[in-house]
Amino acid sequence: MKVQLIASTILEDPSWAGTDYVGDDETVTSADELAEFAGRNCYLSFDRPNPKTRENVDYLNHILDVGHESVLEHSSATFYIEASRSVLTELERHRHLSFSVVSQRYVDPTELGIHVPPAFTELSGSDADKAKEVLLDVQSFAQEAYEYLVHIFSDAGFPRKKAREAARAVLPNMTNSPMVVTGNHRAWRYVIKNRWHEAADAEIRELAGELLRQLREIAPNTYQDIPTEPYSYGG
């Protein structure tokens, strides 16, 4: 799996549009400070009147406590992700994210590779060998079937994209599906709070953990309440 942050919101106007907002210190990130500015705009509390929420970390902690997460929607983060088709299917259920995904009609997906489900690494000995053999056999068979179907449809006069459109029916869920995904921080928090959980699919849980790690680099106070270990039913 590959997960790489490629874009995020950066503040452009140090004067805060001529308002009376008193900016925090330079260590506060653009995403965290923009969320605070948006929240203070709702109540015109630009001068930080409450000492308990004077610092950005405390202000956003209060925002998270009361569920006023709309202020987190003003900043976004964009990731380049290489993961399986099954992860894409899971991730697309989060409808506030925006996707641009490699086309299986225009691109030969057999050249993109596969992603082995994490459960395979939990096997040992002969079980691991047998499981890996089955997986590789399926990959080989699917690739041969795909190429054969493309050949049949192409010889029948179908354009390449229509041939691939038909042939992709035999591709396994583990097929690599490079994607560009954008979401605001409220949306990303929703993804992580649902997928960074012991009961989640192992591959998307791995994705959620890596997303969390990188999102904390650009918005640490926005994600301050998310645990470093996956959520569990026990707490």
UniProtKB/Swiss-Prot annotation:
Entry keyword set: FAD, Flavoprotein, Methyltransferase, NADP, Nucleotide biosynthesis, Transferase
Residues spanning the signal sequence: none
Sites where the protein binds FAD: 70, 93-95, 184-186
One Pfam family named in its UniProt record: Thy1
Reaction equation(s) it catalyzes: dUMP + (6R)-5,10-methylene-5,6,7,8-tetrahydrofolate + NADPH + H(+) = dTMP + (6S)-5,6,7,8-tetrahydrofolate + NADP(+)
Cofactor: FAD
Keyword Manganese: no
Domain called ThyX: residue spans: 1-229
Top-level taxon of the source organism: Viruses
Residue interval(s) of motif ThyX motif: 93-103
Binding residues annotated for dUMP, in chain numbering: 90-93, 103-105, 168, 195
Catalytic machinery residues: 195 (involved in ionization of n3 of dump, leading to its activation)
Gene Ontology terms for molecular function: flavin adenine dinucleotide binding; NADPH binding; thymidylate synthase (FAD) activity; thymidylate synthase activity
Keyword Chaperone: no
Cofactor remark: Binds 4 FAD per tetramer. Each FAD binding site is formed by three monomers.
GO biological process: dTMP biosynthetic process; dTTP biosynthetic process; methylation
Enzyme class: transferase
EC number: 2.1.1.148
Pathway: Pyrimidine metabolism; dTTP biosynthesis
Entries under Gene3D superfamilies matching the protein: 3.30.70.3180, 6.10.140.450
Role noted for this protein: Catalyzes the reductive methylation of 2'-deoxyuridine-5'-monophosphate (dUMP) to 2'-deoxythymidine-5'-monophosphate (dTMP) while utilizing 5,10-methylenetetrahydrofolate (mTHF) as the methyl donor, and NADPH and FADH(2) as the reductant.
UniProt-listed HAMAP family: ThyX
Family: Belongs to the thymidylate synthase ThyX family.
PANTHER family per the UniProt record, alphabetical: FLAVIN-DEPENDENT THYMIDYLATE SYNTHASE
Oligomeric and partner information: Homotetramer.
Protein name, as recorded: Probable flavin-dependent thymidylate synthase
Classification lineage: Viruses, Duplodnaviria, Heunggongvirae, Uroviricota, Caudoviricetes
Originating gene: 48
